[in-house]
Amino acid sequence: MSLAHTAAEYMLSDALLPDRRGPRLKGLRLELPLDRIVKFVAVGSPLLLMSLAFAQEFSSGSPISCFSPSNFSIRQAAYVDSSCWDSLLHHKQDGPGQDKMKSLWPHKALPYSLLALALLMYLPVLLWQYAAVPALSSDLLFIISELDKSYNRSIRLVQHMLKIRQKSSDPYVFWNELEKARKERYFEFPLLERYLACKQRSHSLVATYLLRNSLLLIFTSATYLYLGHFHLDVFFQEEFSCSIKTGLLSDETHVPNLITCRLTSLSIFQIVSLSSVAIYTILVPVIIYNLTRLCRWDKRLLSVYEMLPAFDLLSRKMLGCPINDLNVILLFLRANISELISFSWLSVLCVLKDTTTQKHNIDTVVDFMTLLAGLEPSKPKHLTNSACDEHP
């Protein structure tokens, strides 16, 4: 065996990817990076603001401070604070004998409304986890495995071709067999391509993804409506008039009709309201961007894997409308690019292919590795001319 053939075999052996068996791909990302950010912000920010509201309530004691009459004892003043906080009604005299009441319940419901908002924003995440993640996980495991295996099969094919070339004494026989194999598509492995083509006709994943982001937009709009309708109405009201002349106290003459109270937690209420509006206003463009990514193909990822035999979705113009499961899978393949060991090898081969296309007819990794192994990717011209001379 010559030194060149030995070097070619070593080079091809090094190009083979390690066989990953057993518990593998444990770090598979089943959420896109931007979706994960949206989830943490949309769910985490209400919980953070809720903890801020509770912390203020625990640190300052009573959330309101009522100006009770001077003849009230400490226990009576505490009763006034408790009664006014329980009712949280603002009494306003519109005219003689006309008493108009306005509820200030958003102040009391602030922590619980934030908890409800966090749970509401977590519903799309649960939908994705239970409706899409199981199928997506199996799809990614199969496709990643097949992409790496297809690359390895291509390298092993070149190794086999090199051995045949070494054993063949007649170069005509080798090149005739090689051309026959190419014409009959022996070098192609259509299982993966057909599976991806089937995913173009499937829409379960993309429907779940669209529903997830649409629900986020709907819940965000509902949050705006809630804040605008309920919080804005009491946003600047720091003081209110409270009436405790109810029940047994309704006939007590020494009890004033209205007692002025001040909301000590108004600043926290305002901070929470403004923060919620700002946070979800920032999230809306991110959610819309996530949806727009479904309107275009990740052609760079596809172009790299065009180096594999039978993976010609781009060259054969098999890509149609991008709103299907295949596009969602491609987005997650891009997010899990670290699991695709073959991607780095094929990216290098794509760069090298661009520098040699003027000299050689290189279409796949088989052609390029054949060239690197010291074999011509196509029949040499002197053999072609000799064959033409023999068969004029």
Swiss-Prot record:
Subcellular localization, as worded in the UniProt entry: Cell membrane; Cell junction, Gap junction; Endoplasmic reticulum membrane
Alphabetized GO MF terms: calcium channel activity; gap junction hemi-channel activity; structural molecule activity; wide pore channel activity
GO biological process: cell-cell signaling; monoatomic cation transport; osteoblast differentiation; positive regulation of interleukin-1 production
Record's catalysed reaction(s): Ca(2+)(in) = Ca(2+)(out); ATP(in) = ATP(out)
Listed Pfam families: Innexin
All ranges on the Extracellular side of the membrane: 61-113, 237-267
Principal place of residence: membrane
Residue positions the entry lists as glycosylated: 71
TM region(s), chain numbering: 40-60, 114-134, 216-236, 268-288
GO CC terms, sorted: endoplasmic reticulum membrane; gap junction; plasma membrane
Family to which this protein belongs: Belongs to the pannexin family.
Name recorded for this polypeptide: Pannexin-3
Annotated source species: Homo sapiens (Human)
